[in-house]
A protein has these predicted regions:
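N-terminal glycine-rich phosphate-binding loop for ADP-containing cofactors
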Residues: 1-220
Length: 220
């Protein structure tokens, strides 16, 4: 499966032998990301699970077994990380400070950069799907408005079309840089000297820890 918004159990309904149906979810970029989720559908059997574990270990990846639910495990936590970055952006925190505080907290890339890598249009599709499948208050309307502005009005899809939160130069012609137009999308801009860097760092860590605890509570 290529996305954590496709329920494995639903996909298996069209398969005659549902006990042999199992999800294997990789992360992008695949060549760098060691984690692989193995997703159990409602009727997945032990033989299918064992085969999936063997396959993932054979290619040198680290498998974890999760139950079928929206976002599985990892993307629920990653989604909260990205959402917190968007929340800071809407609060008026300078984009560069958002990115740097996240990296200072130990994250390999900032949430805005990660959004670009995942693709902003995909993020918007997930927001819309969540809103349709659950209830309107399951999503943050301000974050949806931000994604609609970036994707549908500005045509900024992320790295894949060389413009998202960042501008991407042609290969070999410099480094990516935050899009200067971002400030116009912020309802307000806060003075960086008034912001507590430690608080911003902790926010990134706490939201992911809380979401991880929720996945345990939800039996993911």
């Amino acid at each position: 499966s290529n996305t954590s918004t496709l329920p494995i159990t639903s996909l298996a309904e069209s398969f005659k032998e549902q006990g042999k149906f199992v999800g294997i979810h990789f992360f992008s970029p695949v060549e760098k990301m060691m984690l692989v989720e193995i997703i159990l559908g409602k009727n997945t059997g032990d033989v299918a699970l064992a085969a999936a574990l063997d396959d993932v270990r054979a290619i040198g990846k680290t498998p974890i077994v999760v139950n079928d639910s929206r976002g599985f495990y990892a993307n629920r936590c990653v989604g909260r990380y990205i959402a917190e970055g968007n929340e800071m952006f809407l609060e008026g925190v300078p984009p560069a400070m958002i990115e740097n505080c996240a990296k200072m907290a130990g994250m390999p890339v900032g949430p805005l950069s990660l959004s670009d890598e995942v693709a902003l249009d995909l993020g918007l599709k997930v927001i819309k799907a969540t809103e349709a499948d659950l209830v309107p208050n399951a999503i943050n309307p301000d974050q949806k408005k931000l994604m609609v502005e970036l994707v549908e009005k500005q045509g900024r899809l992320g790295r894949k079309n060389s413009k998202g939160f960042y501008d991407y130069p042609e290969k070999g012609k410099g480094q990516k840089s935050l899009w200067p137009g971002l400030s116009a999308l912020q309802p307000k801009q806060l003075d960086p000297d008034t912001l507590d860097i430690e608080e911003l760092k902790q926010r990134f860590l706490v939201v992911q820890a809380v979401e991880a605890a929720r996945t345990v509570e939800d039996h993911v």
